[in-house]
């Protein structure tokens, strides 16, 4: 049923169980790059064929940030208002990126289920989802697939680039596909990794200067992800001597990432990172 997806075996089992007995609302969570939107849409088509409505954050009017707003939910409410004999799946991708008051509207449609209508929510930032919605949803934490499964995407690529892509993507199939097919994305990711290496080896003054270059939230979050991956890699290779130091740095990175994902000030959070990382 899910043969076209590169999935962790445990995750595949959970998703197949869901398809056999679907909950009215399900929340998929995972780190960026595994391909949540693709997974959710595939599940939707397995459940309802072509009767899948896909909703994702978009720019509305003069807004600078893509979000799901009240009009989007009103549109969904209109679709599901009437009773139906066939299945309909509503996919809400990146559901954490909403306008004020929208979570209350989402909660209302989940609390008032319509027969044969199913909701698939996705998020890379589950702490931003209200407990009231989580408690009314089946939650599946999608694990990264193993490296051997990801290698299927690397056929036909020269050995040097294959090694780079595997390291940069860190077992995230969607990221891996993007790096393979888009040279600009590959170059940007490589630069982010270079910055992460320089951050780790530099002193505090150097780190402060490096993070001052990041103005865009998305770029800052991507840098944080690279820094986390590289910190873990260095530890596994034996280059970091003390586990307590590793744990402290990874906890710091995780905290900064959470704050950035919940609209924490980019400059302030990166300054905190530069000063406290050691």
What residues fall within each predicted segment?
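Flexible beta-alpha connector loops of hexameric P-loop NTPases
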Residues: 62-69, 95, 139
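Conserved alpha-helical scaffold flanking the Walker A/P-loop in AAA+ ATPase domains
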Residues: 13-18, 67-90, 97, 101-108
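Charged, glycine-rich active-site and insertion segments that engage polyanionic ligands
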Residues: 1-34, 39-51, 55-58, 116, ...
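Short glycine-centered, acidic/aromatic-flanked micro-motifs in structured strand/loop junctions
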Residues: 30, 92-94
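Walker B beta-strand of ABC/ABC-like P-loop ATPase nucleotide-binding domains
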Residues: 90-91, 121
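Conserved catalytic/switch belt of AAA+ P-loop NTPases
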Residues: 97, 101-121, 131
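Short catalytic-loop micro-motif centered on adjacent basic/acidic residues
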Residues: 91-92, 141
């Amino acid at each position: 049923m899910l043969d076209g997806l590169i999935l962790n075996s445990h995750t595949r089992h959970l998703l197949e169980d869901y398809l056999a007995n679907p909950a009215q609302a399900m929340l998929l969570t995972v780190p960026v790059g595994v391909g949540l939107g693709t997974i959710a849409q595939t599940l939707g088509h397995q459940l309802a064929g072509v009767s899948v409505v896909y909703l994702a954050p978009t720019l509305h009017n003069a807004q600078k940030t893509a979000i799901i707003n009240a009009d989007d939910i009103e549109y969904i409410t209109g679709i599901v208002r009437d009773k139906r004999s066939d299945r309909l799946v509503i996919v809400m991708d990146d559901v954490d990126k909403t306008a004020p008051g929208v979570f209350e509207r989402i909660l209302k449609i989940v609390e008032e289920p319509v027969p044969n209508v199913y909701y698939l929510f996705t998020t890379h930032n589950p702490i931003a989802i209200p407990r009231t919605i989580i408690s009314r949803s089946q939650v599946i934490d999608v694990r990264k697939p193993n490296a051997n499964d990801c290698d299927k995407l690397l056929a036909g690529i020269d050995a040097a680039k294959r090694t780079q892509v595997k390291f940069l993507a860190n077992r995230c199939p969607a990221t891996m596909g993007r790096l393979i097919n888009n040279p600009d994305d590959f170059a940007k990711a490589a630069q982010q990794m270079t910055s992460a290496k320089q951050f780790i080896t530099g002193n505090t003054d150097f780190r402060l200067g490096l993070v001052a270059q990041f103005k865009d939230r998305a770029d800052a979050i991507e840098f944080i992800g690279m820094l986390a991956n590289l910190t873990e890699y260095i530890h596994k290779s034996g280059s970091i001597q003390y586990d307590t130091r590793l744990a402290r740095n990874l906890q710091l990175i995780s905290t900064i990432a959470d704050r950035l994902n919940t609209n924490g000030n980019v400059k302030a959070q990166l300054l905190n990172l530069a000063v406290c990382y050691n």
